Structures are given as C-alpha cells and as structure tokens.
C-alpha cells in the first residue's frame, strides 16, 4: 500500500509546525480523504474517521472557541486518536491551548497554514490523490512534446530511447525512459512519472546511460506529466495495412482510463521524431476542433457530388 509521511505533506504545502516531535512527523498517511470535524465537536462520533487528516477551518475553529475550556479539551481528546496522522488549522488561526494539551497527550502533530480552508483542502486532496494512487509500470518513453504527454512504446530495440533523445535535442522534455509509472489522477486523467532510480536518465545502446539533465540542462527534463497520447512504434511490414487517414480509432487502457493510441511504422529514411511531433500537434488540433481527416472527407464528398452533377 502506498503511503505519505506527515513531513512530506508539510514540505509540499509549506505548513507551519505548532507542535510535532520528530517521530510524529514520520507518521504515515494511508488515505487521501480529509475530515473537517463538525458533528464530532458536538459529541457525535458515530462514523468518525480518525485515520484521516483532520482539517479545521473558520467554522470549526469558531465553534471550538465558543465552547467552555473543559468541554473543548474533552472533545479534542476524543478526536485525537493514535491513528490520526495530523491536525491542520487553516487561515493562520490561533491554536487554542486545549488543542496543544490534547495533542501532547495523544502524540499528534498540530500544523497550521495561512491558506484559505477550501484552497488548502483542494491542494491537500490533489497531492494525496496523486501520491497514494496505485501505480502501473509500463515499458516505454514518456515525453513532454509541446506541453502534451506522449507515451512512446514499441518492441525492444525499435529505437524508443533514441527517438526520445532526438526529441530532447529538438527542444522537448524527457519525463521517463524505459519504465514509466502511470496512475489515474481521476476518472479521465492519466499521469506518468519515472522510477526514482531512473529519473532524468536515458539508455542508448552502444553509448550507455546518459544523464539528460547534466548534458542538456534543467529545461530538457520534467518530473511528471499527464499522459494524453500513446504512440506505438513497429517495424514496417509490406503485408500489413497501416492507417493512412487517421480514422482508425485505437486506445490504450491503463488503470481503467483509456487514451488514444496511434501506430507508426519504422523503416529506413523515416524521421520518427518529426512524425511523432506531427502526431502530437495533430492530436492537439483535433482536441481544439480541427480535424484534418474530417476536412478531407468533406472535400472528397463535395468533389464526388460535383462530378456526379457534371456527368448527369
């Protein structure tokens, strides 16, 4: 099971530590769900989920402050259980002394942020969703081409890494080579990242392992990217029919999310990196409503209609 440490959340969201011994910052977070305790403050703890991060905004804080000191302390002691990873107070609100006392007794980190509660909740959920999502490892090269994530796949030795290197030289960015870890960020979005050991590295047969960041600079690499298009490279076969109009819809499904995939035949004399660039731009054009295949079809239909009229 994937997990995130409390200290990683602190670093990512730039939270301030009000109370937190070093060992408390090593606590694991195993769920991306967040709880904003409301009914719990009235003493209703049925269906309470203590394993989640507890986030307090202005409403929760105001109600808490309105309570008598002893009642405030008793409620907080019931909320703060050993499995609770941390408590975050938003908007830079002052943490009441009773909360600090309960946190010390129950060994729970108290954190604060100046961000608005809704914004903080969104950022926290997004970060935890991406970190805790199940990864699927696929073989290929993930490139950022014109701001679009393109997954290049194909048989071993077909030239995926060499194509990736050529794309880097043409100003695009390497995300991952050889192994791409992909996860579903939501129901319609795939995201890809490199394995930590392979980050910024690319392997070229006959040359060895190349550190792309060292050779080409920080602008040539990217730590992660949305995966929007898959390109499959395969050896050219005269007996096989390849799509020439772009109207054969094919998909690659990963983690229950499907993305379009195109097949590109590889043979001597073809500049594959340029072809992939064109494929990426063509996909983006389709997303914007410009479909060259449809335009060709309309022109062809119009030409046939005119010829039929002339020959009538």
UniProtKB/Swiss-Prot annotation:
Pfam families per record: Hpr_kinase_C (PF07475), Hpr_kinase_N (PF02603)
Binding site for ATP: 154-161
Region named Important for the catalytic mechanism of both phosphorylation and dephosphorylation: 202-211
Swiss-Prot/TrEMBL keywords: ATP-binding, Carbohydrate metabolism, Kinase, Magnesium, Metal-binding, Multifunctional enzyme, Nucleotide-binding, Serine/threonine-protein kinase, Transferase
First-tier enzyme category under EC: transferase
The keyword rRNA-binding is annotated on this UniProt entry: no
Required cofactor(s): Mg(2+)
Catalytic machinery residues: 139, 160, 178, 244
Enzyme Commission code(s) on record: 2.7.11.-, 2.7.4.-
CDD domains documented for this protein: HprK_C
GO molecular function per UniProt: ATP binding; magnesium ion binding; phosphorelay sensor kinase activity; protein serine/threonine kinase activity; protein serine/threonine/tyrosine kinase activity
Subunit structure: Homohexamer.
Family per similarity comment: Belongs to the HPrK/P family.
Domain free text: The Walker A ATP-binding motif also binds Pi and PPi.
Protein name: HPr kinase/phosphorylase
Organism annotation: Streptococcus pneumoniae serotype 4 (strain ATCC BAA-334 / TIGR4)
Gene that this sequence comes from: hprK
